[in-house]
Amino acid sequence: MNYKYSAEEKQIIYNYILREYGQVDHIIFLSNEHIRVPIEYDILVIKKQNLQILMTFGLGAFKSHNHEENTQERAEIFLELPVDWDFNKHENMWPVHFLINIVKYSYSNHLTLKWLQTFINPSYFNKSNKIAGFLDLSWYGENSLECKINNDFFVSFYQILIIDDEELFYAKTNGIRALSKFFDDGKSRIVDLNRKSFVK
């Protein structure tokens, strides 16, 4: 089975993204070789005044085949990157690969992506101490949290917050919700591989 939005669903989601997140600067089109799961999606790049948003577009078509979940929720996910992030540099492509890996994990494990789920990368991001990311609610206003398609399902929008090895250990010890509070204190959510740990 191939998971993809209908033409109508795709237009609804795209218009929602334009309204709540901003104009799409360009699209990173993914080949079947990149995706390796039967979900048709690409990655949008949305340029804001002081940051760029890297967002999946099409992931929300995936309906979990885990019957125990029994949920109408589906998800698109995104990262915030510095405004001058250069995707032409090989070392700057890891956010794209991380998004792809999360999608693969979701499909392979029959999971609907949800708030506070944590994903550990196989290696550190670009030789930094950052190793994982967790899903948090969007901060782009109350209307940016979810897009209702019809009576069958709605699509939630989750931001991936990148964390280091010490923060990951803190989350394992104290819970991911406790860690998430450090990011709710007005701190920047833009990816910064050089930022100091919040739990030191």
Curated annotation (Swiss-Prot):
It comes from Ureaplasma parvum serovar 3 (strain ATCC 700970). This is Uncharacterized protein UU111. It holds the Pfam family SUFU. The lineage of its organism: Bacteria, Bacillati, Mycoplasmatota, Mycoplasmoidales, Mycoplasmoidaceae. InterPro entries: SUFU-like_domain (IPR020941). It comes from the Bacteria.
